[in-house]
């Protein structure tokens, strides 16, 4: 990014579209010193980013660029905003999770609710905007020309420290830290007094928190590395006179981490205690993990601490209203980063991301996608299959080069789409992508605005024409046929009064015996990998992996209001977007849950 900007700057300065290399290097030093920003959770990664930029701008006889004010350390997903601070601490912050005392959590929630409706809150936010003068001083520091000597670098370091130590900025940072801390506060006996709404408002008015609570806020800020963008870069996010941080970055590009927020048992125990992963069901694995409290107390304590850390993050992400569209279902960093970044870019800015396609197309992300379409932020979605192993993930895993804007009202209403690409070079081929108007997406899929599975412009135009001219099919309720019984009741050998537990992978189109666990090895059975049936077995019922109590199955069917017929038409729950058939059905006996 820095090289591209530098070449353009040099071209403008020289009037030559292909400027001399020395003028590009000169421009690159200015670009790095004024335009490039970054945040990383890992301090070492932040330092390596600086080193990389220094190597790019190395100029013998001149000091390295001063980057301390631009490359910073912190968790860029966890941070308050002026608008959320203005709203105070919501009651949902005190939702009990693993390790919390439910009675204490309930009491804090009740206290918070009373404080939110009390007289102290009648006049709202006591003030959360940072004076424009603070941002102006940061802008002046970064707007100066490149340091000519080591003394200039030291002078800038001292100026930055003075700005960071500004009392107004420090107070606002404490307020923002306290707001975040409320969502990850330990609700247990002996813990310091939590940051409830009343204490938070008092802090905003300049009243002290109390030594124990203050120490707790500082410790949590250190542990979770809260990062408040509007305070870290006040010259980028202007606040005075607005209800939220306005402004933002002109361009944001990146490939955010693709991870789940929740703790992955397999990843955690793979090296620490692999024996707990060798059991069949979730319930059995949980029992094995609980047994570590006696056999391996150190591993168990570390596991519980990691699990609580993940749950506190989930509570903050889902209850704080930081991510109203992306913090749904199983939380992932890629979805959260996508929504976060779209709020960090300026209204006339641009965003370019490499993200899993599911961030934009999966059902849990329907609200995020609908917002992107309705606000006309989405501009380009180039979907790639990983068949050439661009990323170290499964070949069938799709990722997208996603381009968006900051919400400017002057943008085009068309969205460019390409699907199932395997290389960037394919984009040069005619017809490799198609365009669709966002108004047509509302027509085709009014509920979620989801993209139809079209391969070229001809298919999307035909679908739009059919949708406009044909009558729509009325909505009809249907019942998802799945197993909702508790896995602790499952058994892996047949018992009397038990029925087979049927899995979607065991059926295919009009074929209830597509796969079976009969004569399957222990490892494949444990990992849920049935074998394909032979044509000679077509008339035989597929052998399941587990059986469930018949009473559990009948109770489940009754709650779903299913008919009392002996046979039911079942729909397979999952299908790949690339499958020829995305609705796979078979007829199964009613005795199969």
Task: Locate predicted features.
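Polynucleotide-recognition surfaces of large bacterial nucleic-acid defense/processing enzymes
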Residues: 52, 70-71, 76-251, 256-257, ...
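Conserved S-adenosyl-L-methionine
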Residues: 1-84, 179, 268-279, 355-369, ...
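Short, ligand-facing micro-motifs at secondary-structure edges
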Residues: 383, 576-592
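Phosphate/oxyanion-binding active-site loops and adjacent basic polyanion-contact surfaces
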Residues: 41-48, 222-229, 326-338
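Alpha-helix capping and helix-loop boundary segments enriched in small/acidic/polar residues
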Residues: 23, 325-332, 356-360, 389-393
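Conserved beta-strand signature within the Rossmann-like core of class I S-adenosyl-L-methionine
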Residues: 349-354
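Short, solvent-exposed loop/turn segments at the edges of secondary structure
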Residues: 31-32, 66, 394-399, 592-593
């Amino acid at each position: 990014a820095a090289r591209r900007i530098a070449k353009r700057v040099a071209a403008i300065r020289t009037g030559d579209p292909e400027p001399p290399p020395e003028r590009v290097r000169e421009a690159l030093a200015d670009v790095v010193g004024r335009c490039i920003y970054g945040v990383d959770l890992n301090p070492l990664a932040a330092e390596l980013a600086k080193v990389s930029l220094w190597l790019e701008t190395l100029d013998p006889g001149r000091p390295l660029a001063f980057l301390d004010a631009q490359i910073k350390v912190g968790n860029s997903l966890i941070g308050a905003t002026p608008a959320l601070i203005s709203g105070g601490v919501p009651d949902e912050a005190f939702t009990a999770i693993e390790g919390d005392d439910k009675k204490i959590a309930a009491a804090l929630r009740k206290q918070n609710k009373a404080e939110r409706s009390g007289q102290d809150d009648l006049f709202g936010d006591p003030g959360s905007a940072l004076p424009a003068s603070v941002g102006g001083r940061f802008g002046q520091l970064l707007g100066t020309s490149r340091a000519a000597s080591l003394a200039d670098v030291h002078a800038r370091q001292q100026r930055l420290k003075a700005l960071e130590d500004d009392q107004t900025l420090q107070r606002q940072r404490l307020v923002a830290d306290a707001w975040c801390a409320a969502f990850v506060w330990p609700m247990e006996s002996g813990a310091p007094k939590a940051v409830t709404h009343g204490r938070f408002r008092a802090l905003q008015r300049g009243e002290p928190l109390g030594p124990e609570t203050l120490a707790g806020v500082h410790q949590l800020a250190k542990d979770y590395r809260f990062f408040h963008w509007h305070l870290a870069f006040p010259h980028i996010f202007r606040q005075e006179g607005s209800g939220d941080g306005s402004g933002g970055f002109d361009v944001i590009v990146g490939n955010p981490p693709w991870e789940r927020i929740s703790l992955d048992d397999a990843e955690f125990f793979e090296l620490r205690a692999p024996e707990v992963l060798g059991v069949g069901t979730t319930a059995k694995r949980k029992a094995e993990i609980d047994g570590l409290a006696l056999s391996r107390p150190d591993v168990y304590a570390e596991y519980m601490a990691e699990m609580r850390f993940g749950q506190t993050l989930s509570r903050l992400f889902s209850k704080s209203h930081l991510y109203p569209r992306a913090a749904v279902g199983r939380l992932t960093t890629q979805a959260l980063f996508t929504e976060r970044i779209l709020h960090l870019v300026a209204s006339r800015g641009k965003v370019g991301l490499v993200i899993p396609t599911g961030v934009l197309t999966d059902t849990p992300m329907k609200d995020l996608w609908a917002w992107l379409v309705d606000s006309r932020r989405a501009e380009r979605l180039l979907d790639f299959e990983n068949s050439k192993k661009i990323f170290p993930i499964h070949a069938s895993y799709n990722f997208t080069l996603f381009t968006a804007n900051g919400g400017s009202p002057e943008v085009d209403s068309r969205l460019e789409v390409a699907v199932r690409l395997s290389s960037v070079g394919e984009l040069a081929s005619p017809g490799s992508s198609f365009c669709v108007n966002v108004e047509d997406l509302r027509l085709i899929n009014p509920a979620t605005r989801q993209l139809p599975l079209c391969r070229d412009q001809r298919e999307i135009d035909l679908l739009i024409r059919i949708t406009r001219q044909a009558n729509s099919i009325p909505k009809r309720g249907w019942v998802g046929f799945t197993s909702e019984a508790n896995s602790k009741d499952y058994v892996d050998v047949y018992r009397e009064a038990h029925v087979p537990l049927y899995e979607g992978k065991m059926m295919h189109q009009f074929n209830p015996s597509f796969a079976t666990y009969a004569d399957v090895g222990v490892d494949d059975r444990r990992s849920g990998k049935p074998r394909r049936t032979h044509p000679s077995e077509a008339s035989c019922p597929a052998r399941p992996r587990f059986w469930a109590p018949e009473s559990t199955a009948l109770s489940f069917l009754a709650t779903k209001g299913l008919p009392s017929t002996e046979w039911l038409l079942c729909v397979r729950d999952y299908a790949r977007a690339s499958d020829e058939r995305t609705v796979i059905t078979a007829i199964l006996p009613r005795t199969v849950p």
